[in-house]
């Protein structure tokens, strides 16, 4: 058996020699005389997780007569053909105990089986782009801690013991066996070539461009006062980092993230944008201190979905919730009918939607307006009279009920998000009320959700689930769900709703939370800024470390354009560029109608200029697309229920295909519906995403395709209507408020680039485009127009 090593550092020399000797002894006693083993040290963090794999072992035994390794288990024989073993090392003195599934720490609990399962999934996902993808693999933790004297080995971890490769090999075979064989990858003639391909692909994916290097330098910079201040403040008061778009809020939050990890603690980073999760992982996985066992980055929806699921709340929704929603719906319809009949009596005609709201907008609560608008539009599409109004009312109610019956059970979390959060908070804040409200004592199925099992009585019946047990289970589940996190960092926290805020404060304590807030100017999800200085109307201690107020992302010439845009539309106050960027940067506005979207020549030229600066493809260009015109998709109906119990029908894309191709590009397609299925972008990929996903991202060059179409799409959206209704005052105009909503989105898009902002206008003659061109001219932007075509002399009419 040939055993090779790759990339072994001095730090791991003794460990690798120990493993090689152990493997040689094992296979010398077997019938496997031919085969190859590769022990790779420091396999790069090329997957979706954090941190390198300290040891990755590939084993291949050719299928030859008399050449085999036999794994015996319960009198059954399994023949080892190919095996991949990953070993992650964890030195953490905060670990105080461990059992068959969980590591226990002063900062929470960790389900290590789940984490190792994630590592295996990440490596298999990565291998799909290699020349021989993995069917299976087995990851292990080798854990050393002074916080616990216990020592043991099981199928997944070696806890405070020596690194016994014979046990690891046995458990790896046990976990990957299938039928009579152990086959983690397909037949290979040259295992070395396969392993080197894996390493080369991993190196290509993790290659660091100049922007990522600079970003890492900024994140890990020593002596920055704010992260030190936040660390000193942990456990005393919530920290709130406030500032405008581009002033460095997310950068400072990642500096805090790094400071917490570097201090030896565990930390969680939450954001609304799935693509920002990818962006942060792309950068932070290059910092050695960040590992899957101490750093976690997720979307808020991911966190709350898993939290509410583990707490058992999702299992409790039933007909009761349906009746509650329908009760609210009927009440709102009856309010509408009273006003409709009153309007008919006064004017002798039935009101349309515009007439109705012009007459009664001051008399109807804004929370009722969404459902009432749907009802009136439904009536408009039907010829109705006093006789048929009651019949149409019943038909509308039945239609809404059928919608809920079909969707509520399958998509309770997404469809009824706010009510799920409300009940999750009730469970945390008042477990006794929750216990009685849902009659938990008789809900035996709830025990399985809460990870509990109880023995039956002698007569075969189950005992009641006592409140004391329930209360204890809540505490244990919260500790498991914290995933070993001392601190939680929340980006763009002005957009959180009240229950998101309250749950996070309950789980982590406000004093262990750090948030960024951009104020009203940067609201996207909601129309009201969340106040993190109060909980249930009670003030909580808060600290406000100052930010510089300067824009470290954009160069001066882009800042000029952005400030002119903001000043013209009065949507935000000006920002200042960093001193070193004075006179640099450019804005290009392309008005050429002959080019749809953008030309490949334009993109390639911009890319080449970025490459000269040392940018990787990931850093170089970020292409922003409107949701129409550049993708094909199939749709199905779904529902969403907001915090006011309004039930809305939405179209969900089940599949999206990017209808842009460029042979010179490796495209990372970020327009898919389920972004959780994507991998972290590689360094050699160019990102194509929707405008709606760009918050918090940056690139050397940003290409805004059909920016005018995006503006008009957002202005006519349901979100814009809600924003207008919520913010409407006596002298405000609804259309102006819709435009304000859309302009905030445009502002977010044009603050993403560092060096070049390229804007392609789909229709240069519309009002928005004309104004953008005017702003561009006044601020020194480059305007690309159609070339003038002059007639020949003999074609002149004189």
Tell me the role of every PLM-derived stretch:
Residues 209-242, 246, 296, 314-336, ...:
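Conserved helicase NTPase motor core
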Residues 242-268, 272-289, 298-301, 454-459, ...:
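Conserved helicase motor core of SF1/SF2 NTP-dependent helicases
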Residues 1-53, 57-211:
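Intrinsically disordered, low-complexity Ser/Thr/Pro/Gly-rich regulatory segments
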Residues 293, 315-465, 603-613, 618-621:
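Coupling/switch/interface segments within P-loop NTPase motor domains and analogous charged loops
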Residues 8-16, 108-119, 249, 463-466, ...:
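Phosphate/oxyanion-binding active-site loops and adjacent basic polyanion-contact surfaces
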Residues 64-76, 354-356, 370-371, 723-728:
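Intrinsically disordered, low-complexity domain-flanking/linker segments in eukaryotic proteins
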Residues 54-73, 190-315, 748-751:
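P-loop NTPase Walker
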Residues 53, 81-83, 237, 486-487, ...:
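The start of beta-strands in P-loop NTPase/AAA+ ATPase cores
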């Amino acid at each position: 058996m040939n055993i090779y090593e790759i990339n072994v550092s001095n730090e791991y020399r003794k460990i690798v020699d120990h493993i090689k000797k152990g493997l040689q002894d094992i296979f010398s006693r077997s019938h496997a005389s031919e085969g190859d083993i590769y022990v790779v040290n420091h396999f790069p963090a090329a997957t979706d997780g954090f941190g390198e794999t300290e040891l990755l072992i590939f084993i291949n035994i050719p299928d030859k007569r008399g050449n085999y390794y036999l794994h015996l288990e319960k009198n059954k024989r399994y023949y080892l053909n190919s095996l991949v073993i990953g070993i992650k090392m964890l030195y953490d003195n905060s670990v105080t105990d461990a059992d068959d599934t969980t590591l226990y720490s002063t900062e929470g609990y960790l389900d290590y089986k789940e984490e190792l399962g994630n590592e295996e999934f990440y490596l298999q996902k990565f291998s799909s782009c290699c020349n021989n993808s993995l069917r299976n693999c087995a990851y292990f933790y080798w854990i050393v801690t002074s916080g616990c004297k216990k020592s043991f080995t099981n199928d997944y971890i070696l806890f405070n013991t020596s690194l016994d490769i014979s046990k690891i090999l046995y458990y790896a075979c046990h976990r990957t066996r299938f039928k009579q064989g152990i086959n983690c990858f397909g037949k290979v003639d040259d295992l070395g070539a396969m392993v080197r391909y894996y390493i080369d692909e991993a190196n290509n994916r993790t290659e660091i461009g100049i922007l990522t290097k600079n970003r890492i330098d900024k994140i890990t910079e020593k002596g920055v006062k704010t992260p030190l201040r936040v660390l000193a403040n942990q456990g005393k008061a919530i920290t709130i980092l406030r500032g405008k778009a581009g002033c460095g809020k997310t950068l400072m939050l990642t500096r805090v993230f790094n400071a917490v990890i570097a201090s030896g603690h565990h930390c969680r980073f939450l954001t609304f944008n799935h693509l920002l999760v990818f962006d942060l992982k792309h950068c932070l996985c290059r910092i050695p201190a960040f590992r899957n066992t101490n750093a976690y980055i997720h979307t808020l929806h991911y966190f709350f979905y898993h939290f509410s699921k583990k707490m058992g709340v999702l299992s409790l929704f039933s007909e009761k919730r349906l009746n509650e929603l329908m009760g609210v719906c009927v009440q709102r319809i009856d309010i509408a009918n009273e006003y409709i009949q009153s309007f008919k009596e006064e004017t002798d005609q039935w009101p349309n939607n515009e007439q109705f709201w012009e007459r009664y907008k001051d008399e109807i609560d804004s929370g009722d307006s969404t459902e009432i608008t749907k009802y009136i539009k439904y009536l408009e599409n039907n010829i109705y009279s006093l006789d048929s109004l009651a019949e149409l009312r019943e038909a509308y109610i039945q239609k809404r009920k059928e919608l809920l019956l079909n969707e509520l059970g399958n998509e309770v979390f997404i469809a009824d998000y706010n009510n799920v959060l409300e009940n999750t908070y009730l469970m945390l804040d008042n477990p006794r009320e929750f216990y009685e409200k849902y009659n938990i004592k008789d809900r035996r199925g709830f025990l399985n959700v809460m990870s509990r099992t109880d023995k039956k009585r002698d007569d075969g019946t189950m005992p009641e689930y006592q409140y004391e047990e329930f209360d204890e289970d809540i505490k244990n589940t919260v500790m498991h769900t914290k995933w070993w996190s001392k601190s939680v960092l929340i980006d763009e926290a002005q957009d959180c709703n009240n229950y998101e805020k309250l749950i996070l404060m309950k789980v982590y304590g406000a004093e262990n939370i750090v948030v960024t807030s951009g104020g009203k100017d940067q609201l996207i999800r909601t129309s009201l800024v969340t106040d993190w200085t109060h909980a249930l109307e009670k003030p909580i201690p808060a600290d406000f470390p100052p930010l510089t107020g300067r824009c470290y992302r954009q160069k001066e010439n882009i800042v000029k354009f952005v400030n002119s845009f903001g000043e013209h539309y009065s949507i935000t106050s000006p920002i200042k560029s960093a001193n070193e960027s004075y006179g640099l940067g450019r804005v290009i506005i392309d008005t050429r109608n002959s080019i749809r979207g953008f030309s490949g020549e334009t993109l390639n030229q911009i890319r080449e200029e970025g490459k000269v600066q040392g940018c990787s493809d990931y850093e170089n260009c970020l292409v922003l697309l409107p949701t129409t015109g550049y993708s094909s998709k199939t749709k199905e109906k779904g529902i969403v229920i907001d915090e006011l119990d309004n039930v809305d029908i939405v179209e969900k894309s089940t599949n999206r295909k990017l209808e842009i191709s460029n042979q010179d590009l490796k495209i990372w397609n970020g327009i898919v519906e389920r972004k959780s299925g994507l991998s972290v972008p590689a360094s050699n990929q160019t990102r194509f995403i929707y405008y709606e996903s760009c918050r918090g991202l940056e690139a050397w060059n940003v290409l805004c395709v059909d920016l005018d179409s995006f503006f008009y799409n957002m202005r006519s959206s349901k979100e814009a209507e809600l924003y207008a209704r919520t913010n409407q005052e006596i002298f405000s105009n609804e259309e102006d408020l819709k435009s304000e909503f859309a302009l905030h989105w445009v502002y977010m898009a044009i603050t993403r680039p560092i060096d070049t902002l390229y804007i392609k206008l789909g229709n240069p003659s519309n009002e928005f485009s004309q104004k953008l061109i005017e702003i561009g001219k006044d601020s020194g932007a480059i305007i690309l127009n159609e070339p003038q075509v002059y007639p020949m002399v003999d074609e002149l009419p004189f």
